[in-house]
Amino acid sequence: MSNPKRYRNLFGITLGTGLGGGIVRDGELFLGDNSAGGEAWLLLNRLDPAVNAEEGASIRAVRRAYAMACGIPHDNAPDPRTIAEIAAGAAPGNRVAAIEAFRRLGVVAGDVLAQALTLVDGLAVIGGGIAGAYPLFLSHLVRARNAPYEGHATPLRRLAPLAFRIDDPAEREAFLRGEVCSIEVPGSGRRILYAMRRAAVGISRLATSEAVAVGAYAFALRELDKR
């Protein structure tokens, strides 16, 4: 039996100079009444609720976290590419601090996705200049997104759908396979197929400038089709 599950909703974030966000609803870009839909940068910062999420998931956030862990001024911290190389052991520096900087990025970005996807209920795509360092933060991001609320007698799931990493072969296979069960419609005597509630987190393969160009082109074509 083939899986009937199909997706038409998506939430995307970009990790770079800032924290960007965008929503695709039922196959169309969601703008909002004030053209301010998807302002992810203003969501809660899980690790520092006194500031917004962008201060925990951006270039300056990675540099700041590395500088704090090293006890050096923020201006003396290297750029995220170098910090990623330090974390991978490919460049000299404080490796523990570099790993921690990207862990914090993953936690904040994962919580942002959890907040957004609570309402959007769709797939998640991550892009931007820092996305290339995903091996250092994606596991923390998915863990934060799947993390339960612990304040209940029994832990309560943060999101109804379970998140899977598309870049991981085993998780991708589990996501694509899913589970389909047959449930009875009360009072009808009929049974329907019900697919497992699941979502995926993926990394954009497009460079930031290319993604912007492709997105703008697709949006323009759709707007022309409406005329």
Where is each model-derived feature located?
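ATP-binding/phosphotransfer module of carbohydrate and carboxylate kinases, centering on a glycine-rich
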Residues: 2-3, 47-227
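Glycine-rich, phosphate-binding/catalytic loops in enzymes
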Residues: 29-31, 39, 141-144
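Short beta-strand-to-turn element immediately C-terminal to the catalytic PLP-Schiff-base lysine
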Residues: 22-26, 30-32, 45-46
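Short, basic and Ser/Thr-rich N-terminal targeting/leader segments
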Residues: 6, 15-17, 197
